[in-house]
Amino acid sequence: MEELTPRRIVEELDKYIVGQKNAKKAVAIALRNRYRRKKLPEDFKDEVMPKNILMIGPTGVGKTEIARRLARLVKAPFVKVEATKFTEVGYVGRDVEGMVRDLVETSIRMVKQEKMAMVEDRAQKMAEEKIIELLAPYPVQQTAARNPLELLFGAARQAEQTDKNQEQRIKRIDFEREMLREKLARGELENEYLEIEVEDSKPPMLEIFTASGGMEEMGVNLQDMLGGLFPKKKHKRRVTVREARKILTQQEAQKLIDMDEVTAAAIKRAEEDGIIFLDEIDKIAGREGYGPDVSRGGVQRDILPIVEGSTVMTKYGPVKTDHILFIAAGAFHISKPSDLIPELQGRFPIRVELESLTCEDFQQILTEPRNALIKQYTELLATEGVKVKFTENSLVEIAKIAYTVNEQTENIGARRLHTILEKLLEDISFEAPELTGKEIVIDREIVLEKLGELAKNKDLSRYIL
């Protein structure tokens, strides 16, 4: 984290998101402040609260992507929730505490994967030993005596003979296992089939009442509650050695990690580094106390204690929300940030306005980011042996059309490019298997031929683009 200076964070975000310098700067500072807080003395650390961010801007300009890439950059637990999914207590809908529970689940998954990666080599060796056991099992010890008379006559001689046979068999199997071990190391058995026992991954679920009175599926499973009284259900599967190695490595890795340690580390990570992205905050900005939107103000009041810092009960234990970073976002076309209740406004001190995308922005989005759309489409078609090239003037035209359609109809930001490229490459994608080995050049004329009329006709572009 030390090398992630605000400037470096912005540079990393620039690899995936075009423009929006102010928003990138705000999140970079918020992230760096977390690192600074961790270096403070213990007695002062708890006094420093994160400065939550409110992003204001139309859809498709990069609000969610900025938050998501930021979380990936620092390996922080991240959840995106829509504020419209929540309702105040007493109405049908999700309880606002659900977002904290989701964050803890994400954190548990992250820490568990990290711990499993640390023991992967050991787990793989154990899995390979299991595969060898399944391919060359030791014989089952059989009782020498078959009827009561044998217990009196000749039982000792027979037992001696049986033991010798057993020893020879075991030696033969040991030799066979060594051969299998060598073949397994050389990858010669990858496509051989064998039968393995697989544990059921889905435990029985219970719905329980939460502290706020709502019904929330917390994933409490009977096994945790009854302390392993019931053994885990298993079923047999016939798989290749390659698949068996993956399944058994996973099972062995889970046995090697300490889940109590995972839970403690995950809760700490969620509390200290967690990021909750509250989308569509503008949709609950009204303060009406009647009609279909009666619970809007109630949702804001319910969100308030979580944002300002409270303790939420989860199935893994209590989680403090004091130092979780909240990033709220909304288009605010109809409502204004000032329509939020004053207490909630005060909890989002950093306001960032994201600009609508220009024609130049669209051009950059097509080619510059690491996951640029043009790269995505050309790589997809390359898997069929079709080489697609876009000329510079074709990219300019695509950007112009995207900008024009956004201006004439609803502004959906960069998502408009997906619609336009799908329409443009529709025939090529359909015929790709028959075009193997060919090179297709897409220039301005082809773009205008496919999309020109649609873009000019307002009614058509409203439905098709």
From Swiss-Prot:
A single Gene Ontology MF term assigned here is: ATP hydrolysis activity
Task: Detail which positions bind ATP.
Answer: 18, 60-65, 279, 343, 415
Membrane-spanning parts:
none
Quote the InterPro entries the UniProt record gives: AAA+_ATPase, ATP-dep_Clp_protease_ClpX, ATPase_AAA_core, Clp_ATPase_C, HslU, P-loop_NTPase
Residue ranges that the Swiss-Prot or TrEMBL entry lists as coiled coil: none
Recite the UniProt keywords alphabetically.
ATP-binding, Chaperone, Cytoplasm, Nucleotide-binding
Compartment list: Cytoplasm
Query: Which GO terms are recorded in the biological process aspect for this UniProt protein?
Result: protein unfolding; proteolysis involved in protein catabolic process
Q: Give the UniProt entry's GO cellular component terms.
A: HslUV protease complex
> Per the record, a Pfam family?
AAA
Q: What does this protein do?
A: ATPase subunit of a proteasome-like degradation complex; this subunit has chaperone activity. The binding of ATP and its subsequent hydrolysis by HslU are essential for unfolding of protein substrates subsequently hydrolyzed by HslV. HslU recognizes the N-terminal part of its protein substrates and unfolds these before they are guided to HslV for hydrolysis.
Q: Which family does it belong to?
A: Belongs to the ClpX chaperone family. HslU subfamily.
- Summarize the subunit comment: A double ring-shaped homohexamer of HslV is capped on each side by a ring-shaped HslU homohexamer. The assembly of the HslU/HslV complex is dependent on binding of ATP.
Protein name according to UniProt: ATP-dependent protease ATPase subunit HslU
